[in-house]
Amino acid sequence: MLKVGAQIPEIVALDQNGEKINFRDFVGKVTVIYFYPKDFTPGCTKEACSFRDNMGRFKDINVVGVSVQDVDSHKRFYLTHSLNFTLIADHDKKVSETFGVLRPSGVAERVTFIFDKEGILRYVFDKVNPENHAEEVLAKIEELGLM
């Protein structure tokens, strides 16, 4: 798993619209990258909706959800739940492997990474409560002086 102090990896993946996203392009803004096991499951849906409902409080902060489903699954998940942040389709599992969160079962662990504006990893949540995770992330960003 990436350790605090690591640079955001230079890796390219597709978003929910099939557009290429280079993670290094997130440098310049505080960035929250949260990994979740699977679209449309109860915990993952609660976590995504928690971020959606709190996006107004994530001013000038990139929020990015990542799981191993494909673009089509992410697009449906995004539209069904009116999500308002980027989802990364890690269907080849390279993003999860790079971040060190791929389970032996082939899905991502529920882990969240907070990067500062310089792209330096400042905090890792490896224990996540999906229902109120967005609020936990906001509190940690504030505690770290990144807001």
Residue ranges of predicted features:
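Chalcogenol-based redox active-site neighborhoods
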Residues: M1-M147
